[in-house]
Amino acid sequence: MSIALKQVFNKDKTFRPKRKFEPGTQRFELHKRAQASLNSGVDLRAAVQLPNGEDQNDWVAVHVVDFFNRINLIYGTICEFCTERTCPVMSGGPKYEYRWQDDLKYKKPTALPAPQYMNLLMDWIEVQINNEDIFPTCVGVPFPKNFLQICKKILCRLFRVFVHVYIHHFDRVIVMGAEAHVNTCYKHFYYFVTEMNLIDRKELEPLKEMTTRMCH
């Protein structure tokens, strides 16, 4: 990453503290292997494939946390331009509106300004990945039976961040010179969720044309 990009993607812009893996754990080793593959310039399609002999849940857990960190950082770079005035509803253009629902305050799908939606989303994901019952960090502790379903929901909601950034704020990304970095992150995300079958195709529709050009 260039010096300019490092200034754009600095830790002060991050929405949340990064979640890290404990050194010495299996997931830490998988994370290192995944990062090494990316840094070596290997084909992203190949980089997301489950390594032989590795557990699918571990592989998914590593990537979910990594994508949360990366997408959180991307949104953090443009969040000052994403306001209740500029983005009164969380959307992806005129055809797609995303409503927030959780088990706490918003029991029914509710239209919210994009920055409020993003805050709730990042808070919600942070709770999931810091929950030892869902993302266990101790060796030998099994993942819950509904682990992949939870990850699908996390990744589906993270995809909506890409949709909003690309459709409503990509001009800022270009001004900051971060276009290539964001595109690479998106391609990595897209190849992973399609390789592991973690997002329904209909959810990917808002960026279908761009994805066809970018991820051919």
From Swiss-Prot:
Query: Which SUPFAM superfamilies did the record assign?
Result: Mob1/phocein
Keywords linked to the UniProt accession: Metal-binding, Zinc
Q: Does the keyword Magnesium apply?
A: no
BP GO terms, sorted: regulation of hippo signaling
Q: Lineage from the top down? A: Eukaryota, Metazoa, Chordata, Craniata, Vertebrata
Q: Which InterPro entries match?
A: MOB_kinase_act_fam, MOB_kinase_act_sf
Tell whether Transferase is among the UniProt keywords.
no
The primary gene name is Mob3b
The UniProt record gives the binding positions of Zn(2+) as C82, C87, H164, H169
What does the protein in this record do? Modulates LATS1 expression in the Hippo signaling pathway which plays a pivotal role in organ size control and tumor suppression by restricting proliferation and promoting apoptosis.
- At the top level of its lineage, which domain of life is listed? Eukaryota
Which protein are we looking at?
A: MOB kinase activator 3B
**What Gene3D superfamilies does the record tag this protein with?**
MOB kinase activator
Pfam families for this protein: Mob1_phocein
Recorded GO terms, molecular function? metal ion binding
